[in-house]
Amino acid sequence: MTTTIKMITKFTLGASLSILISSYANSQSGGLVDEYPELANLYNAFDVTQAGIYDAMAAIGLDPVSQDGRMELKMHLDMMAEMDHGGHGGHGGGMVMNMDGHFGQLETDARIELGETVRGRHSDSQSQDAFTNSSALTELASGVLAQGRSFERAVWDIFADDSTSIYQKQMAIDEAVKDYQSSNPRLAVSLSPKTADLYLDHIYADAFRMGYPKLSGLLYSNQWLQLASLEAIIIGQVDPQFGGQVPLTLERYWNKVGSDTGMTMFPAPTEMPSAPAISPQLYSQAPQASIIIDNLNMLESALADVIAYPNLQNRASVIDQLVAQYTSDDMYLADTMDYLLNALRGGIFNQGGPAIGDLSRSERNRSRDAMSMNHTMIMSSPN
């Protein structure tokens, strides 16, 4: 009976969110589908792939073959916590990440399947239903992610429409933010930036990256392209000399994705990409949207940590508690300066590298001159 009610509730929630997403998509002529069809198809694939990552980890966690890997991962996470790292290696934690992971062929097989998913074509309805259909997510989590994705699609459509001015785009973004906040407040992440501790130092932090480096690399690469392609679109409108750079971001993305098993000469991000680091133009032109998208990306990664954490009891309850922390306007709030510092502290290179400029190695703890850094970044504080 409980399962039936849950299925009905998720179906109803999914239907209402599908209507919301469709209304956003239909409101923008000359949007992403018209101007950048390859990106639009990839964004559909990203939703299906992300839900697939969650479900794949949940399935591996239940597989008896993974028992040794789960024990090793739990010991590793416990050891890090005892070393007073707050349950997380902090920014730059990718330096200690075992690229072979803890689940061997199980993760490799999942990565191969998900690599095919991200390369496939997926309808709007498949994308809209992806989170609702995920068995690893709760009703609340799937609803928040789906409503968040509808907002992101609105943002991408607005900026992709080259028939409107920057000012008109900013006004349209303001309306999209209001719609996002008011359409179903229970399913909206906070409009205020969240503290780094909420993402980096929660009890289950690092389980995703340490346990599943191939899957985390894929998720972070997908998040990187969403921000990097948006940076290329916006900066081409702000300064025409940088126009036509979307194909470059696509090339860099596919280099990060690499082979079916995730092997590549161009490393995937080891840190979650953030808007100020990868798309400074988004923060300059639409700081509120930047914060919402970063909160959503943080939530997506934190959910992956909870799902990846081995042998966790009451996982559904933990997921809903986590979601509530991101939707709350009272808990774990950061001021603007801390938000920017936290976004940049992990390093642009570790977050996947710049959208347009060149950065061949980590810039952390080194000066721009020492790096010979050529990174196109035009970011100003919001008015």
Question: Can you describe what each PLM-predicted range is?
Answer:
Residues 2-12:
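Bacterial N-terminal signal peptides that target proteins for export
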Residues 254-352:
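Intrinsically disordered, low-complexity segments enriched in Gly and acidic/Ser/Thr residues
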Residues 12-22:
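Bacterial N-terminal signal peptides
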Residues 1-2, 27, 314-317, 337, ...:
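...the same signal can extend to comparable exposed beta-sheet modules
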